[in-house]
């Protein structure tokens, strides 16, 4: 039974619900890609599906727009897969459980994937009918945007003719995005040596954090569970000796981690001291993040007594804790040109203990290329002193602001006519695929926009139905005037 069937715009909501029924997390996009190809075949549209699962669908201009300049509509097929503790959905095989309440669409206990499923839904609803006048369309649906914009980076853009691009990967109605930061993923690896640890085993956990997008929401000042764990372990070790067995935290380098866990082995009969110290640390941290992460919790739970437990050597553990405590995180510099815009930042998104090393995955962002390089150099220098290495991947360029943008001017005018107010024209401290396409297609005029969505990349993600409808009408009018 359809959950969204009674909502308008009906065909947009129809396709969004179908998309939500198909597993399409980053790295798992074959099924959603094939779905788009099947759609193109069914509607007798020219298409291209590459080896990465990117899909391009072409449609001729209609209703007098046959000879107009082509327009690209672009979004991504993959979603961030996050779920609440206790949720048994398998993102590899299961669809989402949609809910609607008071005009707000959510998914039960998981991310919704409105980012960027709504772009795909808009595109398919436009492609299936000749009801709406539009120029020739090039629908470009990329994969793995959420893990480094890998699809857009790999895409061969030579078949594309459009010099005007509408990106549908924004989450604030009335905001027109015209520039963004560049970024890169930095992988810190610290080698480990192990020995046998004796005593009682404890699980230290940091949980209850808000999390969020590591670019868009880095300015919120929210706590990072992995870095909090480094602080907890350092504070605990001041008073109570322990051996560190392993630590893990976070799921995506572009999401602020909401939880982290470490296992330690302590001398026997120290449980009371450990609980007291952890309670003090938890209280202090909770007070510091009362406004941003009111539910933050640090706990220590004793597990089965283990006579011999494999643990890191003291030297290895000290270096790991030092890295967590001293590697930079969060906002590094604000822009002087655009008030309120973060210029340079980084986020430790994934912390994982491997067989012979600890890996720390950072998302590094800046709208100034030299600052991005300087921040990477700082990380490399500190990591080198700890005996580790830093490698980078997924480097993508900043999307520079165009002084002369006919598309931006047109969209501002149409917005004022439709809404009775001026749109907010802004830059974003996050990577969007516009930067990749602008780097590949000379003289590309591009604007990103979309309906209202909140708490993306978290299980609280939501999408406003009325905003989806207004944005659909806005999109149709833009295409109508791009003759």
Which residues are covered by each model-predicted region?
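Acidic/His- and Gly-rich active-site-bordering loop/insert found
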Residues: 3-104
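Zn-dependent metallopeptidase/amidohydrolase metal-coordination segment
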Residues: 12, 336, 343-356, 422-477
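A short beta-alpha structural unit
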Residues: 17-21, 263, 297-310, 347-351, ...
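Active-site metal-coordination/substrate-binding segment of hydrolases
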Residues: 65-147, 152-163, 198-201, 314, ...
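Fold-level recognition of mixed alpha/beta catalytic cores in primary-metabolism enzymes, strongest
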Residues: 135-225, 233, 237
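His/Asp/Glu-rich mid-to-C-terminal helical/loop segments that flank catalytic regions of hydrolases
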Residues: 158, 222-239, 267-271, 318-325, ...
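Acidic-enriched catalytic cores of C-N bond-cleaving enzymes acting on peptides and small amides
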Residues: 195-199, 218-248, 268-345, 384
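Active-site-adjacent substrate-binding region
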Residues: 224-227, 231-247, 401-444
